[in-house]
Design a protein with these regions (language model features):
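Feature detects long, helix-prone N-terminal segments enriched in hydrophobes
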Residues: 1-177
């Protein structure tokens, strides 16, 4: 589970790097419009976005299997790794997205505002995926009756920033640092 969480997390960071590099490459190589290089970069970016989401759902499936097998330690390690090491990703993603979309919407005189929901939806799906891993761990704790976190923690796993506080509270309650 921890390996899959690391792969998913690396994919998230790779997507962030590509979110910066691909548009820059498209601007650099796109002097003559949508040529082969620009299309290739754009297609590569989209393919990597799909791969990151596939890795996320594979991680969720692995968490579900760990839950079914009662592998609390394995699930806790993957969940902890995924939640805590994704904090810088979400901060950088938010800052970059605000900057880029502010510039794009301003430069297009508002026309690009229609595309703003796309990266927001992409990020929300990542949050849902990591939240599903957290829910599997919480369900396992409740199943084993080990210092059960309250049911509110299920919902908190799906809210950015609050999910981190929920994660830390649960880990402290379990005696983890």
């Amino acid at each position: 589970m921890k390996k899959l969480a690391k792969i998913f997390l690396m994919g998230m960071y790779l997507h962030l790097v590509l979110s910066i590099a691909v548009p820059m490459g498209m601007l650099y190589f796109g002097d003559s419009g949508w040529n082969t290089v620009v299309m290739g970069l754009f297609e590569f970016y989209l393919a990597m976005a799909v791969i990151v989401h596939i890795a996320g759902w594979v991680c969720v499936a692995a968490a579900g299997m760990a839950y079914c097998r009662n592998e609390a330690d394995n699930l806790r390690k993957g969940w902890k790794w995924l939640k805590l090491w994704s904090i810088p990703f979400y901060i950088l993603n938010f800052l970059y997205s605000c900057l880029v979309w502010f510039v794009l919407v301003g430069a297009s005189r508002g026309m690009m505002i229609l595309l703003v929901p796309l990266p927001v939806i992409f990020t929300c799906i990542l949050i849902v995926q990591s939240g599903c891993v957290g829910i599997c761990y919480i369900m396992l704790l409740r199943k084993k009756h080990q210092k059960c976190p309250s049911g509110v923690h299920y919902a908190l796993q799906f809210f950015p920033v609050i999910d981190i506080f929920s994660t830390i509270l649960i880990l402290k309650k379990q005696g983890d640092e």
